[in-house]
Amino acid sequence: SDEVTARYPFVFNSFNEAAKAFVAGTEAEPMKVYIAPYVYWIDNPDDPQVRVGKDGKEPFGLVVKCPYLHLVGLTKNPENVVLASSRGQTQGAVGNFTMFDFWGDGLSVKNLTMGNYCNVDLEFPLKIELGRKKRMSAITQAHVAYCHGDKIVAENVRFISRLNMNPLNGAKRILFYKCYMESTDDALTGTGVYLNCTLKFYGQKPFWRTDMGGAVFLNSDFYVCHDEDRQYFCKGVGPLTVVDCRFHV
């Protein structure tokens, strides 16, 4: 509540307000942010104003410039801490709305969910009334996050959207460990190592490209959740390694 947060200088009930207090971390002393279970809207889904980007870029929910930022959910179940938005191309935004635009090396996210619920229902078992229906059923480009940096780690994180999901796309090198992802096409990070992950494919081509360095899947599970007769990985040509993984239809 506002009453509780007012007592403490570094306790917030809004992620966006907390972000104003972020200071640059280092590899030895990262900027650590602990997030209690709840649904935190990075962009107000009830605001009728259409989001428009600046300087020719897509519209962003929140731009975060903070090296060695560590976001940690205070739970072992990532469904209990949700960073959410609900906008996409022509659906509350002009351009491919992107919830986060992170800048800086050493970003780490753990034990939480990042979701753009423009075309997916948000379900929050801890407090059902915090759930929300999708904005529209017609699937459009609705991004989760861009990341401009190196040595990025996501552990026990759920990434939720459909078209162009973008789980921290743009990272030079990124490890996804024990993560869960839902998407259709043009969605996954082409420079990622996916270790012990679960991915649900609602489209035939989850990658747009992987030629920036190549993606690697290790001991991961792929669930094909569409009715097309074939499943691919990429629209474009690029390196891809799949080791000890399983397909489920």
Segments from the language model and where they lie:
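Sequence-level preference for short, compositionally simple segments enriched
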Residues: S1-V249
